[in-house]
Amino acid sequence: MPQRHHQGHKRTPKQLALIIKRCLPMVLTGSGMLCTTANAEEYYFDPIMLETTKSGMQTTDLSRFSKKYAQLPGTYQVDIWLNKKKVSQKKITFTANAEQLLQPQFTVEQLRELGIKVDEIPALAEKDDDSVINSLEQIIPGTAAEFDFNHQRLNLSIPQIALYRDARGYVSPSRWDDGIPTLFTNYSFTGSDNRYRQGNRSQRQNLNMQNGANFGPWRLRNYSTWTRNDQTSSWNTISSYLQRDIKALKSQLLLGESATSGSIFSSYTFTGVQLASDDNMLPNSQRGFAPTVRGIANSSAIVTIRQNGYVIYQSNVPAGAFEINDLYPSSNSGDLEVTIEESDGTQRRFIQPYSSLPMMQRPGHLKYSATAGRYRADANSDSKEPEFAEATAIYGLNNTFTLYGGLLGSEDYYALGIGIGGTLGALGALSMDINRADTQFDNQHSFHGYQWRTQYIKDIPETNTNIAVSYYRYTNDGYFSFNEANTRNWDYNSRQKSEIQFNISQTIFDGVSLYASGSQQDYWGNNDKNRNISVGVSGQQWGVGYSLNYQYSRYTDQNNDRALSLNLSIPLERWLPRSRVSYQMTSQKDRPTQHEMRLDGSLLDDGRLSYSLEQSLDDDNNHNSSLNASYRSPYGTFSAGYSYGNDSSQYNYGVTGGVVIHPHGVTLSQYLGNAFALIDANGASGVRIQNYPGIATDPFGYAVVPYLTTYQENRLSVDTTQLPDNVDLEQTTQFVVPNRGAMVAARFNANIGYRVLVTVSDRNGKPLPFGALASNDETGQQSIVDEGGILYLSEISSKSQSWTVRWGNQADQQCQFAFSTPDSEPTTSVLQGTAQCH
């Protein structure tokens, strides 16, 4: 009988059924004798317990399974952990060593992917990439490999000297996936039907479409809209472009209609060509700014780095000089405290000054863009559309300074910008830049002017205060941005003279913070000023969120405006799962105070059905009530709602989603992100994907995971608790690394058919020998006979399947039988049956 080791944890019938579903295929098919549950319990056959008292029965030698982790050789889908860090998941072939323990085989190419210095190790450098290495320990001294079969985990320990040092979060470009060819469209359709007390009626529909085609690394995109109201309808193309990544440059090449980044000069739209660096192609730990930390360890030491009291980095370093250049900063400011703990326990500390601004780059990193083409005016404007060229660059000079600048030119316009940003240590971070622009208009009038910009940011960890200030100054009324220079009609009184912006946030204690922000603009030609000031407090206590906000606005062509708002949000989990009730009060100058109550929540097991009920009332007794709901299905998101007030009522409706055409057919999906995945479950329908509400394979076995992170490893896992009864999976997790805009394929080899416990007897009616091996003549599937002559079979359907059973090499030590399920739909997840073997 199977022996079970446990920790006193009682199982419900549902949990036991799940254990059978997970463990029997592994225990009885010859792919292994161990399985695991959520509590990491082990289930395995102890050969000592496998003796039988039934006369005439023979047993098969199963002594190899008496050793922990000793399993049948073969190919397994495993998680690979290198030096205690998970690096990948893939299929690895294992062979048995002299002790009958499994040892992994690697190809030279797989070793490269692990970061091993293949070209610097003579025994590997002379081999082809597809050469097989049976014992890595003999080639790289100090290497150890252990296969934890219970968790399908391969633990590798390889000396650091044999490995390249990659930044944290690094994913080898060899894993970046261009995806498979596809045509797709994203659509968002909304409509409303308004009816008024006077008898009037108005209807409106709107359709947004983002269309695309992928072939290899190339991405063709188009964005179009359609609108319709009671009188007119129109179709507009917003933009179209062709794009691909340039991996060697970590950049994107774009041909067509797009917009500049606005990093140096103001952003504008264009039709042309652009080559720009893409920081998404960098590891997470290399994006943005963080200083390089250098020091010296007297022995093998642990280096710990803290910022604002939090540990943001910890690593072991060998004796000698070390360099750390892959930090994840936790904020824009706050000095780094570096602690070196030597092997004898002694500690040394030093402070690395650190503050940052958005444009700052790491030492040695260059961020750039080069654009050329024709200026693209708005659809309804009367602007010029001259040809132009622009180049910008931002370079991290060292731990302290970042230099940046750019050039922009056309027939009647020229601009030059230069600047520097840097850390001031305990004083914060500061940047200063200047842009000069020369503009000539059609009437031959020429202008030139300067724009000065200063930005300052400072964190005060002792008081949890953050301060950010920006100041813009125009030396005269002759400075024009490229957008303004191409406008044929402009108002002198609207020429901006200066602008100041500030933002201050203050954490009082856990969960409560204050903020204040504001801006002021003044203009040439008049003394008027635009002002906007906001202050507020927000927090959370016992799950209840609250905020109080005040805003003051003053504009030259409008009256002053003041507004006060109070918000409360209370969870209702105790009475209504996944729901909240909220209250909002808004008081605005010259308007009646409004009160609003709202209930939001979601239903079904993964929250794919959401709803909201709202009631509002103001001091003039104007009221409005509304009910809205939306449902996220594998084929799109559907929404509908109804509202009514004193003078009108409204119906609204909508659907958003995607249509994907791929080499295997057409699949409907939820709204697609920049990169997405096609799930192929080998024809199995109803297979759900974890962490993606509403996503499940269609009747053809396909589904689309609508959004992925580009150039980073994405984990796609099947929700095994929701698997259909007639579906088994060879693996439940896949890792994909999509390029920008790619549709990558993730295949889950599903075995479709029911699970059956079959009692098999020989021609004389006696149970088959214990340990006999049964194999499916069509699929190659294998199973082992237990002590009662019972076989566990999967993938069984109403179509008869032929099985061969062997318990020796002689002709009289094998037989055959056929088995199928009844034509009627099974009512249990594990069926039972009998068969006679001839």
Name what the model sees in each region:
Residues A162, G191-R195, P217, W226-D230, ...:
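Transmembrane beta-strands of outer-membrane beta-barrel pores
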Residues L72-F94, G683-P693, N764-E778:
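Short, ordered, surface-exposed loop/turn motifs in non-cytosolic proteins
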Residues W176, Q203-G216, N236-L249, E385-N399, ...:
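Feature captures outer-membrane beta-barrel proteins of Gram-negative bacteria and organelles
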Residues K91-T93, G694-Y702, T779-I790:
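Short, acidic Ser/Thr/Gly-rich low-complexity loop/linker segments typical of extracellular
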Residues P2-R4, G8, A17-T29, T37-R287, ...:
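Post-signal-peptide, soluble extracytosolic/periplasmic N-terminal scaffold domains
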Residues T185-F189, N222, L253-L255, Y368-A372, ...:
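Membrane-embedded beta-strand positions of outer-membrane beta-barrel proteins
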Residues G295, A677-A681, Y754-D762:
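A short, amphipathic beta-strand motif
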Residues A98-F106, L327-S333, Y702-P724, D728, ...:
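Short Pro-Gly-centered beta-turn/loop motif in secreted/extracellular proteins
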